[in-house]
């Protein structure tokens, strides 16, 4: 797709032009979009003329890397050079690749994809330094923070993080004319089913003429189209073994070719009932016939996982499938016919064909970016007055995807500790909660506050998203001294926590 390679970036300085673009940083493909002067969300083609840029990084020599390499170049590369699905590792502090003398984190590798998107778009739009970037609803705080860091490394000021289903719902509501129009306001319930290459989200959204409100959401950051491909890879590999062949997964080069062939077969089976997969391996030519019914049978458990999640979201919002006004498909993996069939059974209607599943998230990010621009003083963002008024009339309301809490201990048994949830999942944001706790010991030198994200009481099963200490306490504080903790979550997903002991009013925050 592109034969242009770029050096691994040093940390870039930030400019601050008025334009804000929307970016879908995807597991398999990424895209950048704007809202044009006619009010149309438009995805900007890359230098190869495609609206989609593969989220693949090919590591070269001399600290160079290529994003979205040509298929032939990728096929000739060594396995250790290929970086795919890096989005799944964002926020994982234990993951890093060694390339020469450099340690490549998921944030740095993701920044290369963002840099490619920015540089390609700048050839058409001029300087780009601000963006809204989308993430799966079920990304936790560490993953969201890592996404912002990736943008910063790429020289982008990430003015907001928006959840992918919300972005898609914005695109649907905007392009259908249901959002931002003057007239009678009718509330509609929209189910957004987002099955991408590496992540899955399902969200129930309520839309009126001026308001978009998320009612419930759930998902899985480790479930996506690549898992269907992997399952097909296992099936074909076992068939080759049954024919007396050597397991193709044992050779990294052959394993890569098999995976690519299975990806192609998966896509073909979305359009045809039968396909044949061919693979040369260990001096033999193998030919495996695959049918859509067999593919759907061996991946039925994966689809069922998405159905279970969808039913859970409907139950959380107290909505029956038959009460849905529309079902919107997002993500390239929704092209699999089994997805449409399952959702039609669940909702009693076929999913909408209004949106392009692979572009709608980037388009929604661009609409959200334009809404933010419209609220800035002295900035017109290239939009006319009527369009600006339409954008200014829109409000959105999200919910948090994970419960937020603090670690507490038993006063009589300090080894006993648990997660005390202060903001339950699916709470409308922004929100702020204040609760009181007490100290466990006499004359403490500091009060340690540990912030957790998770749905269970077991601390070890939760994610630690931060910690801080309240120090310089008054001397002689008795056990049982009250401590006030204030937990806040803003519209952009920023978490702020403050703690104050109520005798000397000493406080700290993070």
Say what each PLM segment does.
Residues 107:
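Conserved adenosine/adenylate-binding substructure
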Residues 1-89, 99, 103, 122-510:
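Oxyanion-binding/catalytic loops of NTP- or PPi-dependent enzymes
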């Amino acid at each position: 797709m592109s034969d242009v390679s770029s050096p691994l970036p040093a940390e870039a300085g930030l400019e601050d032009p008025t334009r804000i673009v929307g970016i879908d940083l995807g597991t398999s493909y990424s895209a950048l979009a704007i809202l044009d002067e006619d009010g149309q969300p438009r995805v900007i083609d890359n230098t190869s003329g495609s609206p989609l840029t593969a989220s693949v990084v090919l590591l070269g020599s001399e600290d160079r890397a290529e994003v979205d390499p040509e298929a032939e170049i990728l096929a000739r590369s060594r396995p250790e050079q290929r970086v795919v699905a890096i989005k799944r590792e964002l926020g994982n502090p234990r993951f890093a690749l060694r390339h020469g003398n450099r340690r490549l984190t998921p944030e740095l590798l993701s920044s290369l994809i963002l840099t490619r998107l920015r540089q390609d778009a700048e050839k058409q739009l001029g300087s780009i330094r601000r963006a809204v970037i989308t993430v799966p609803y079920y990304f936790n705080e560490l993953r969201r923070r890592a996404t912002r860091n990736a943008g910063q490394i790429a020289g982008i000021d990430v003015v907001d993080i928006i959840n992918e289903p919300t972005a898609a719902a914005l695109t649907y509501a905007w392009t259908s004319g249901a959002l931002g129009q003057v007239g009678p306001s009718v509330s509609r319930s929209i189910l957004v089913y987002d099955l991408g290459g590496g992540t899955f989200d399902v969200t129930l959204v309520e839309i009126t003429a001026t308001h978009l409100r998320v009612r419930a959401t759930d998902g899985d950051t480790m479930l996506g189209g690549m898992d269907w491909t992997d399952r097909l890879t296992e099936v074909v590999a076992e068939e080759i073994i049954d024919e007396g062949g050597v397991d193709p997964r044992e050779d990294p080069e052959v394993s890569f070719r098999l995976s690519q062939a299975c990806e192609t077969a998966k896509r073909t089976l979305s359009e045809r009932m039968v396909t044949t997969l061919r693979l040369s391996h260990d001096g033999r030519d193998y030919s495996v016939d695959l049918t859509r019914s067999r593919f759907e049978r061996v991946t039925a458990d994966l689809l069922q996982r998405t159905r279970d999640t969808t039913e859970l979201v409907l139950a959380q919002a107290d909505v029956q499938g038959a009460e849905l006004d529309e079902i919107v498909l997002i993500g390239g993996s929704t092209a699999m016919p089994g997805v449409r069939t399952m959702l039609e059974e669940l909702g009693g209607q076929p999913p909408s064909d209004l949106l392009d599943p692979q572009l709608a998230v980037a388009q929604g990010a661009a609409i959200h970016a334009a809404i933010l621009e419209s609220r800035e003083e002295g900035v017109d963002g290239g939009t006319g007055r009527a369009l600006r008024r339409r954008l200014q009339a829109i409000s959105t309301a999200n919910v948090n995807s994970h419960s937020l809490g603090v670690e507490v201990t038993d006063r009589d048994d300090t080894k006993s500790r648990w997660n005390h949830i202060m903001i339950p999942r699916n709470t409308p944001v922004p929100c702020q909660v204040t609760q009181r706790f007490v100290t466990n010991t006499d004359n403490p030198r500091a009060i340690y506050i540990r912030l957790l994200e998770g749905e269970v009481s077991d601390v070890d099963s939760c994610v630690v998203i931060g910690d801080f200490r309240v120090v310089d306490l008054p001397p002689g504080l008795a056990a049982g001294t009250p401590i006030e903790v204030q937990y806040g979550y803003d519209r952009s997903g920023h978490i702020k926590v403050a703690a104050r002991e109520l005798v000397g009013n000493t406080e700290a925050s993070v």
